[in-house]
UniProtKB/Swiss-Prot annotation:
Enzyme class: translocase
Protein name according to UniProt: Na(+)-translocating NADH-quinone reductase subunit F
InterPro entries per UniProt: 2Fe-2S_ferredoxin-like_sf, 2Fe-2S_ferredoxin-type, Beta-grasp_dom_sf, Cbr1-like_FAD-bd_dom, FAD-bd_FR_type, FNR_nucleotide-bd, NqrF, OxRdtase_FAD/NAD-bd
Residues bound to [2Fe-2S] cluster: C67, C73, C76, C108
EC number per UniProt: 7.2.1.1
Source species: Neisseria meningitidis serogroup A / serotype 4A (strain DSM 15465 / Z2491)
Residues spanning the signal sequence: none
Residue ranges constituting the FAD-binding FR-type domain according to the UniProt record: 127-267
């Protein structure tokens, strides 16, 4: 009798647990189709599940997301008027309390579970997707490649200088030992044993890159991509997924991009423009400066200050030398933070924010009237911003492409 009672009790418990699981699933797991109303006009019907960022992309509405949907960049903002659930803690570091009350959400964090009514920026409807072909993918510095893509014939990416595109990568496995890297850069790669790394990605990924090309360079998109290797103090950390993929690309390979996006645009004034860059932050600097001089024929005073580690890390030197020779309103300067003995360097040395201050802004009659455009590693950006604040430069004249943020 006790055995039979035990079996009955066990069966009842199993049935209760099964019913609880089914009930929880009905509440937590979405099934069937839902409808998303966009900007009060367009209605999208789609299967429930996934995140709003991806769901909109599947319908051809590409919301900018520099981090590819990881919740770290804070750029994929939409307004959720109804549906979408409560705002998540991961969103609150990017969205103020006032914005949250107005329905602002990060689309990469919003679950598609119920019908929704949302608002997106009108400019996203001008965003398109292209399958491009790799023209070249050459080292410009030890850890920076210039990826040059051909846009499909008859197509055009209508971007503004300082804008960016998003690049997609399929699931892949990339071995660093297979990278095509010129001999002149092997010293550092050998020193840090970077050839050992392998990047394995099981799902499609998306990342944003500022363009080094400017609008008059028709038919191509140029990017400067720094390889994201594990830091020396954490050698077991995984390497950067997208940068590893991009570094593996070869001429003829197909690459999917979407865009254009951006907000790091030049102001339409006559103020002096001071560009400050470092590392792969060269990309939007080149785009802006070429656009101002070659396309707009700007008469504004323009200076460019670039920080590099050694002479080996300098690139586009001939391009900027030619601009300086052709346009009397443009000058450019490089500061090396760690020049090598063989560099025989007699130019500026030290960190770029100090060099800009000592050699340009210290005795400038009105630095607060200049416009400052910067892009570089986070520590460079922070140092430059502090220096500018100390000089009395207002926020509205400090424009930052924060690719490291």
């Amino acid at each position: 009798m006790e055995i039979i009672l035990g079996i009955v009790m066990f069966t009842v418990i199993v049935l209760v647990l099964a019913l609880m699981i089914l009930f929880a699933k009905s509440k937590l797991v979405s099934e069937g189709d839902i409808t998303i109303k966009v900007n009060g006009e367009k209605e999208l019907t789609m299967p429930a599940g996934g995140k709003l960022l991806g769901a909109l992309a599947n319908e051809g509405i590409f919301i900018p997301s520099a981090c590819g949907g990881g919740g770290s960049c804070g750029q994929c903002r939409v307004v959720v008027k109804s549906g979408g659930g409560d705002i998540l803690p991961t969103e609150l570091s990017h969205i103020s309390k006032r914005e949250a009350r107005e329905g602002c959400r990060l689309s990469c964090q919003v679950n598609v579970k119920t019908d929704m009514d949302i608002e997106v920026p009108e400019e996203v409807f001008g965003v398109k997707k292209w399958e491009c072909t790799v023209i070249s993918n050459d080292n410009k510095a030890t850890f920076i490649k210039e990826l040059k893509l051909a846009i499909p014939e008859g197509e055009e990416v209508p971007f503004r200088a300082g804008g960016y595109i998003q690049i997609e990568a399929p699931p892949h496995t990339v071995a660093y030992k297979d990278f095509d890297i010129p001999e002149e850069y092997h010293e550092d790669w050998d020193k840090y044993n970077l050839w050992q790394y392998v990047s394995k990605v099981d799902e499609p990924i998306l990342r944003a890159y500022s363009m080094a090309s400017y609008p008059e360079e028709k038919g191509i998109i140029m990017l400067n991509v720094r390889i994201a290797t594990p830091p020396p103090r954490v050698p077991d950390a995984p390497p950067g997924q997208m940068s590893s993929y991009i570094w593996s690309l070869k001429p003829g390979d197909k690459v999917t991009i979407s865009g254009p996006f951006g907000e790091f645009f030049a102001k339409d004034t006559d103020a002096e423009m001071v560009f400050i860059g470092g590392g792969a932050g060269m990309a939007p600097m080149r785009s802006h400066i070429f656009d101002q001089l070659k396309r707009l024929n700007s008469k504004r005073k323009i200076t460019f200050w670039y920080g590099a580690r050694s002479k080996r890390e300098m690139f586009y030197v001939e391009d900027f030398d030619q601009l300086a020779a052709e346009f009397p309103n443009f000058t450019w300067h490089v500061a090396l933070s760690d020049p090598l003995p063989e560099d025989n360097w007699d130019g500026y040395t030290g960190f770029i924010h100090n060099v800009v201050y000592e050699n340009h802004l210290k005795n400038h009659e009105a630095p607060e009237d200049c416009e400052f455009y910067m892009c570089g590693p986070p520590i460079m950006n922070q140092s430059v911003i502090k220096m500018l604040k100390d000089l009395g430069v207002e926020d509205e004249n400090i424009l930052l492409d924060d690719f490291g943020g």
